[in-house]
Regions:
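Residues in the signature-helix immediately C-terminal to the ABC NBD "C-loop/LSGGQ" signature motif
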Residues: 42, 56, 68, 72-75
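Short, well-structured segments within or immediately adjacent to enzyme catalytic domains
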Residues: 71-293
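N-terminal cationic amphipathic segment used for targeting or macromolecule association
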Residues: 9, 20-24, 43, 181, ...
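N-terminal leader/signal peptides at the extreme start of proteins
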Residues: 1-35
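Short, contiguous strand/loop micro-motifs
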Residues: 34, 67-68
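N-terminal single-pass transmembrane signal-anchor helix
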Residues: 31-62
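Regular, well-ordered alpha-helical segments
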Residues: 52, 60-63, 67, 79, ...
Length: 293
């Protein structure tokens, strides 16, 4: 007797189509309506209005963040200033390279300094070489080679204010001068030939400036009478104070604190004053020069 095997009918049920075909047909039969020109213009107008409202706020927030970062960096340089003096028997770092005993314009050759018999150079006690190692940063002398100079101007470098804008000609490797958007108070050493940390601390450290926002070429000024030449040098004071943060700038003081100040509270702006564009004297909240006993 022959046994008949059951077979499964694999034929497609009548009236059913594959899912993909069904969807395709539905899409062909369906109706869709795009945006009309008027609706599109309305959307664009709304987005433009939102941009006008948001962009100024975002820009202000960014500038505020840069100001806070600059303040933090200046405060760190103040700490490094103290650490260096403590490690060197109270002797403070110099604000500029001055081979003749007077503040001069610092070029890359002076950053490198003159060789000494022990294999070092005589520029290692200038603040831009002496203090960076205190913060695990690279001394400026390491940027003196032509191939490395462009890296010096990177505003991520702690030696610069992150909001600084350097003139284009300064960014050429052949430009002979490093520009500093932060500077050490140029009046400290000029107060006397051997100013020490103890002398500063014995005076009025809470008002004595150590570091400041330094004016660069092309940046806004507190007053037109401020200096216009030799800007961006590593030593500066009121006449080169840079108000790049909302009409003001940052200062770091000898007691370790730092703060933002309006430009007119740092620079003399009274017309007719012989000090216009320079420091405010007698000093109120800000002292540049040390009073020796």
């Amino acid at each position: 007797m022959k046994i008949r095997q059951n077979t499964v009918d694999r034929a497609r049920p009548v009236g059913l189509r594959p899912f993909s075909l069904a969807v395709s047909g539905a899409l062909r039969k369906g109706t869709s309506r795009g945006l009309t020109l008027i609706e599109l213009l309305i959307v664009v107008a709304v987005l433009g209005l939102l941009a006008l409202l948001l962009f100024p706020s975002l820009a202000r927030a960014r500038q505020k963040a840069l100001q806070v970062e600059c303040l933090s960096r200046l405060r760190q340089w103040g700490i490094a200033f103290d650490h260096y003096a403590e490690d060197n028997n109270g002797r403070i770092a110099r604000e500029c390279y001055e081979p003749l005993g007077e503040v001069t314009i610092n070029n890359w050759s002076q950053v490198k300094g003159r060789p000494r018999p022990d294999g070092t150079t005589d520029s290692l006690d200038v603040w831009y070489n002496a203090l960076p190692p205190e913060l695990n940063q690279v001394a400026t002398i390491r940027y003196a080679a032509l191939a490395d100079r462009i890296r010096f101007f990177d505003t991520r470098n702690l030696i610069h204010c992150p909001a600084a804008r350097f003139p284009k000609h300064a960014l050429r490797p052949t430009y002979q001068f490093p520009l500093f958007s932060m500077a050490m108070n140029s009046q400290l050493i000029q107060s006397g030939p051997s100013i020490r940390l103890s002398t500063i601390e014995a005076g009025d450290p809470a008002r004595t400036v150590l570091f400041l926002d330094n004016l660069l070429e092309g940046e806004p000024r507190v007053h037109p009478a401020q200096e216009r030449t030799h800007l961006g040098q590593p030593g500066a004071y009121a006449n080169r104070f840079g108000p790049r943060h909302d009409d003001g700038g940052n200062l770091a003081f000898a007691d370790g604190h730092a703060g933002w100040f309006r430009g007119r509270d740092v620079v003399q702006t009274e017309e007719g004053s012989p000090l216009v564009g320079g420091p405010i004297l007698p000093p109120r909240d800000i002292v540049w020069e040390i009073s020796l006993p």
